[in-house]
Design a protein with these regions (language model features):
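Extended basic (Lys/Arg/His-rich) segments that typically form rRNA-contacting surfaces
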Residues: 5-234
Length: 234
């Protein structure tokens, strides 16, 4: 998502990065409840994000596109490939476990080593959260595709079977038929979730609703590409 931000002269380098950045990396901590001033309870996901480090700045002249590469999470040198380790040594940065890129039209205003913290988002902002769904191994059609089971009485013997696969005339199973198989362990995006609270001191975001993945799983939080920002309650 491109930013149409115009650089003001009064902002510091960190503030400039915070203004243009639309992505931050972190991990899921779990779920809890928060109460509004009127007593309304909200189920929220607690996400620990940042501080992330700008590990590389891509420009139109050198790379053919404008983007910022972020790194998050410490990792031992021996667990990185030599090309990755060389990139960090050249930049003078500590190795990071996760790296992701975000395309920005004003990426050239950032430099390697700049930090991105959770206060790039404010209360009421809409975000898209990307995580890896929990792996559930082999699952049948009821759990995997929400099929209804068959009757359990009057001698019925196909309670959880998938049912007919195709007609006799076709003589084969059509590609794409929903059947049992591996379920989970896939990339999932939860869109247009509202930021309920920002705890900059502890690098925490409280996001309304559920987020894909297990606790301590790696996630990405970015500005929502669709949806309209909701108005704050008076």
């Amino acid at each position: 998502m491109e930013s149409h931000w115009v650089e003001p002269e009064s902002l510091s380098t960190h503030e400039k990065v915070q203004e243009i950045m639309t992505l931050i990396l972190g991990r899921k901590r779990g779920m809890t409840q928060l109460f509004d001033a009127d007593g309304t309870v909200h189920g929220v996901t607690v996400v620990e994000v940042g501080p992330c480090v700008v590990t590389q700045v891509r420009t139109q002249e050198k790379d053919g596109y404008d983007a910022i590469q972020l790194g998050w999470g410490d990792i031992a040198d021996k667990r990185l490939a030599k090309p990755q380790l060389g990139q960090y040594k050249k930049a003078g940065l500590a190795p990071k476990r996760f790296m992701r890129e975000e395309r920005l039209s004003v990426a050239a205003t950032c430099k390697v080593g700049d930090t991105v913290t959770c206060d790039i988002f404010k209360e009421g902002d809409l975000v898209d959260v990307v995580g890896t769904m929990k792996g559930r191994g082999f699952a049948g059609t009821i759990k995997r595709h929400n099929f209804h089971r068959g009757p359990e009485t009057h001698g019925c013997m196909n309670v959880r079977q998938p049912g007919s696969l195709a007609s006799k005339r076709i003589g084969k199973v059509i590609k794409g038929k929903r059947l049992g198989g591996h379920y989970g362990d896939t990339r999932e995006t939860s869109k247009n979730l509202r930021v309920v609270r920002v705890d900059a001191a502890r690098n925490l975001l409280y996001i309304k609703g559920s987020v894909a993945g297990a606790n301590n799983g790696f996630i990405q939080v970015r500005t929502a590409k669709t949806g309209v920002r909701q108005k704050a309650k008076a």
